[in-house]
Amino acid sequence: MMKILMVSWEYPPVVIGGLGRHVHHLATELVAAGHDVVVLSRRPTGTDPLSHPTTDEVAEGVRVIAAAEDPHEFAFGTDMMAWVLAMGHAMVRAGLVLNDWRPDVVHAHDWLVAHPAIALAQFFDVPLVSTIHATEAGRHSGWVSGRVSRQVHG
């Protein structure tokens, strides 16, 4: 039996594409196989910590921690990287509630959660596994605006 911390930008009820569905299926199958799984994800976009606080619940045998958007009062507009980094910071803070539960491995699902996954793997001093499910170009049918492309690809 392994203790697995999955970090994902999407997990039900936040499902934008296939990522949330994949992580949900993988998490529930790992629980069915006898593993202890925690998924760290986020609350819906555009919500605030007062109306949508960070939650810590168990669903289908999977402990799901969904971080409140932080800082919710910032209007990031088209600054995708600022939003991703701010949300990553919120996810790290939410993940620190696990100090009584130490994973054997952290599994990052996609580049969007690289920051919180790396930070938590280092905090717990455990290996990090990363699956890059898509690129931004792939998510946008091969077209990414100049600003977003420059932010993501440098």
Can you name each region flagged by the protein language model?
Residues 1-63:
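N-terminal subdomain of nucleotide-sugar transferases
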Residues 3, 104-105:
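Structural motif
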Residues 9, 132-135:
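Histidine-centered beta-alpha loop that forms part of the nucleotide-sugar donor binding/catalytic region
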Residues 108-113, 132:
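Short His-centered aromatic/hydrophobic patch
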Residues 35-103:
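A conserved catalytic-core segment of Leloir-type glycosyltransferases
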Residues 20-21, 80-81, 143-148:
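Short glycine-enriched, charge-decorated loop/helix-capping segments at active-site entrances
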Residues 126-129, 137-154:
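Nucleotide-sugar donor phosphate/pyrophosphate-binding loop at the beta->alpha transition
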